[in-house]
């Protein structure tokens, strides 16, 4: 019975270790990636939190679409104010409310709001619990109440944003005026100033600091017009509510002040967060935690962080999750979407961005509801938020106080932060350290590792034990032929195989991208399996084939050397990016190269066990002489006992056997056959094709090559025809090398690979490059399988055979399968535009043309129409805009039964424009019905604008960029309110002020789709589109209604004037005709 040494470098042991390592790493990784830690069975396990209450709040909050431009948004806002009151009353906290309006500030000393909140959104619990102990210290502080709630109806925002990055040429801006209606809840900390300090001094006072600064948690309570907003951002909102409950519980009283910001208007342009910056409380905030949702459930990940110190607060979470690679994606411009985090970071706050991130197919759709998330996901974000904010509010050091590192005037004085590196391990351990530390490690590794390898190689060479790159050596006897050591055998196998295999892997990814590019949308694991099994199978076939033809004991060592060289080059690039661009994701290559360096060092150091080359040559010559003598004796030996002078048949057979023995044990030289000669092979069967090569007799108890003779004096032979001196190599060092380059490296690489693919595999419907996720899968498949490549030639044939069959199956599936399903729905972007002058309406569906045309064929109102599709990179690059005439909208309730809706279009929007004499300036009066969002769109850029009654422009932003703007977005906090806007444009060459005007359109937006029949074209698209499709909003408004009139006699840049001007014009024309 054979007994294998588990540490011997033989196929059975290598195969077993490979299976154990890869399964032991990837089974936990996949479980963590696909599941969420369970919520505690006791919903009140943590004092001050109530998970059941939070879940009921989420269900109430996500009971309908509530975009900023909808009546439901007001219901949600009033519900939030009521819930804050109920929480504070439940904790019996003395608090005040400040109803801040544009003109006055009314302060109430108790919560006595009587808001119109729908019954369905009433609070889930009765908070008048007599069992709650009354805490006098919190209710009656010296001067000030413990909590202040700001009902902010005063803060406004005015600025600009440049148009799409994908547009070539000079980019124009989109100017914006926004009236905010945020809710701010301030919980006073023990170290905070007493009194209403926020009322002292100017809002824009420079460098003013109150106490030791505050900690803010931000969440937006508006949703998109086609999503219920459960995770975007309902979970964040109810988490902030629970944090108010937590910090107003006496045992959890914060040392530093805590601010909960419920901002409104994030989905349309981060407007709520920008409006907050003009509020007095903005100067109090030093650190923040932004809660977001870019998926629908799963784990909440740490998207990004401003610095190392604030990230250490997140490390206190029980189940941390995230990697700095995601932060690098944003900072490098690779990810172009943004959250409120970018607003607060630009203001100088130090903080974190925590968000849900998958599945993206449910993001902004009607599946972003409580049914498609879970209480476990809610708990994951809530528990991480509590741990983070508790750490920040208890930090009384100077970490977040003091002069800034950038010395920028006007920013909060919140200390000096350092760029950081962070990542989790199995969702349990969180590593955080400074980027400068990583840079020091990188630089040290770049310099020290090659020097150490060269130094050890030099010592080996001095001792005549460096067998790498060793050729033929002449013996002391000049008559003897040079003896080959075989040191170059296998030197270039690894790079050639890696190049060929990688090229085939990328070619396969390109093939899928060409034939069925969206398959990764619903089947990312099929693509992973295809890519990984292809690389593994091809790599094994080439390396095992080379080893079959010319076995080499140095193949493993050469593989590590090449891996070290390639890794060193990548580390150079990573180090440059760390230093120049502050990119921290290079930690992957630092750990990778460190592990490969140690494995390479072992591969070199194990040659200390080999004999000196000169000694080996002498021993080989002696063995050769002994073998010749033995052979001579076997042939010429006496047969006196038999008295026979002639050899018989048995003697001839014995002679042949002896000759074979001599030939088998003779040292190989130039005349040795390439295949079939050499020493007895002890290699197990690698494959059916190679079976004969390894069917050689070995002792039953053989457990691999040894580095010396066994106890019985039997000489140990090299493995499978490898160089004879390799019999002296240790048999266990491969296992140490495998453990170095295997488990830990696979964990950090596997987590990042799974994270990136999960984040990007469903972005193709957004217009992102379709090949990108396939490229990432191919790259990480290679990186994840590189640790096994130095040992791959010792694997049995069973693994590559099985993997090749898996590759064939997944390849066929990826080529022919339909890429979408009800669980992974394709996103079609919807918008309906109406010309309010002519009554013409067009429905536009945006996406990949192949699938959009498929969807439109199922829509009844589009039947028989010619569908026109064209690109519009200014709005969404990479997608097609396909339009048809749709069912007229009824967003304004002025439709008379039996009368076509378009007859009432003219009443939806009215405007008047007056020209300032002798100036390039005009004043617009705009009114929309059942909307609080309108837009002025110009055909040519303007240089300045001002909204009457608006707040003073912030110095931190320009209302209009240097390139000029061609749009002004106007957002009211009130309904059906008129805008009065002054617009001014530059004087052209050879022109005088007042000689030229501007043409364009006045547009108003409608976004409330809660009631069926209001936007029947949207209802129809959602009802009749295939089950693998979801219809989501394209722009700020689901419906855009616009007016335009060009008349040269009353021209102010082509704008339609009011009715009085139209009447005057008509009267003048009538007199002119009568005269003629």
Swiss-Prot record:
The keyword Zinc applies. The active site is at 266 (proton acceptor). It is a multi-pass membrane protein. Residues 647-660 have a biased composition (Acidic residues). Zn(2+) 2 binds at residues 232, 267, 364. It is an enzyme of class 3 (hydrolase). Binds 2 Zn(2+) ions per subunit. Zn(2+) 1 binds at residues 220, 232, 292. Its cofactor is Zn(2+). Keywords: Glycoprotein, Hydrolase, Membrane, Metal-binding, Metalloprotease, Protease, Transmembrane, Transmembrane helix, Vacuole, Zinc. Gene3D superfamilies: Zn peptidases (3.40.630.10). Residues 619-662, 701-720 are annotated as: Disordered. The keyword Metal-binding applies. One of its GO terms (molecular function) is metal ion binding. InterPro entries: Fxna-like_M28_dom, M28_fam, Peptidase_M28, PFF1_C, PFF1_TM. Residues 621-632 have a biased composition (Basic and acidic residues). CDD domains: M28_Fxna_like. Residues 1-11, 459-491, 547-556, 606-738, 793-799 are cytoplasmic. The record marks 363 as: Transition state stabilizer. Glycans are attached at residues 50, 99, 156, 912. Its main location: membrane. Residues 33-437, 513-525, 578-584, 760-771, 821-1076 are vacuolar. May be involved in vacuolar sorting and osmoregulation. Belongs to the peptidase M28 family. This is Vacuolar membrane protease.
